[in-house]
From Swiss-Prot:
InterPro entries: aa-tRNA-synth_II/BPL/LPL, BPL_LPL_catalytic, Lipoate_ligase_A, Lipoate_protein_ligase_C, LipoylTrfase_LipoateP_Ligase. This is Lipoate-protein ligase A. Catalyzes both the ATP-dependent activation of exogenously supplied lipoate to lipoyl-AMP and the transfer of the activated lipoyl onto the lipoyl domains of lipoate-dependent enzymes. In the transfer reaction, the free carboxyl group of lipoic acid is attached via an amide linkage to the epsilon-amino group of a specific lysine residue of lipoyl domains of lipoate-dependent enzymes. It comes from Escherichia coli O6:H1 (strain CFT073 / ATCC 700928 / UPEC). Monomer. Pfam families: Lip_prot_lig_C, LplA-B_cat. GO terms for biological process: protein modification process.
Amino acid sequence: MSTLRLLISDSYDPWFNLAVEECIFRQMPATQRVLFLWRNADTVVIGRAQNPWKECNTRRMEEDNVRLARRSSGGGAVFHDLGNTCFTFMAGKPEYDKTISTSIVLNALNALGVSAEASGRNDLVVKTAEGDRKVSGSAYRETKDRGFHHGTLLLNADLSRLANYLNPDKKKLAAKGITSVRSRVTNLTELLPGITHEQVCEAIREAFFAHYGERVEAEIISPDKTPDLPNFAETFARQSSWEWNFGQAPAFSHLLDERFSWGGVELHFDVEKGHITRAQVFTDSLNPAPLEALAGRLQGCLYRADMLQQECEALLVDFPEQEKELPELSAWIAGAVR
């Protein structure tokens, strides 16, 4: 039986692909070396310890139907589109060595005619007239007996969209968690016009086979058929859940303030695991009672626009005379936390 395994996903769903990755990683024999090739449609992928409200423009992502996906490895936030090729190398210990997988990717690029080199712990760069430019970023995960190295290669990514989604709104957010470091990047198409995802995948798999001296048939993973992986349904449900992608954010505080025709409002939220643990309201409104009631209702509420809006609108039952003010308040709060 071969010690190698090659999997290729034909899904562009980030939650599907990350669930496949997680299942394979948990269940692979310790003697196996795995290469998984995949790519995602419009997605911001954040590190395990990151806060999406701090790292991302979540409002614009929602408007543009860009998904958020939290991965199980560390590191920073990245934007994926179909101009990215994603790779994952897995191995049991002591075989696992990220320098080996890095050299495989460098050999693949060299075979395509691109001279790249490792920079720091996570990046691959190429030299251009404007200086070094990043073409690949990576992250890692290790357990007691195995590890993986996954990353992306920029082929023809829409680099203008990086700034759209990775620059958060200027919210008054005091947040813990790992902050992303932005790098100067370039696409491989600048060096190899017309290069395709399929060509890059072929180069990586050939370099993978060459390094280990054996070949295997590729297994195609498709969303049209549930992958034959134990616990895949449960893993996918978790990977696609709000509780994982947003709710796992480190604790943070959020200050909102706005002035309406009927008075100024200042809201202070403390948020932990996606739930509001403390809500304070300050106002110079002549009728502060609805806002005081709102503070009580928001305690324990999910920090989600639809849930906050629901709690605001529920106040109309007790304060029907606020039929003008409460919808304004509701729309403002929902917009501010998206």
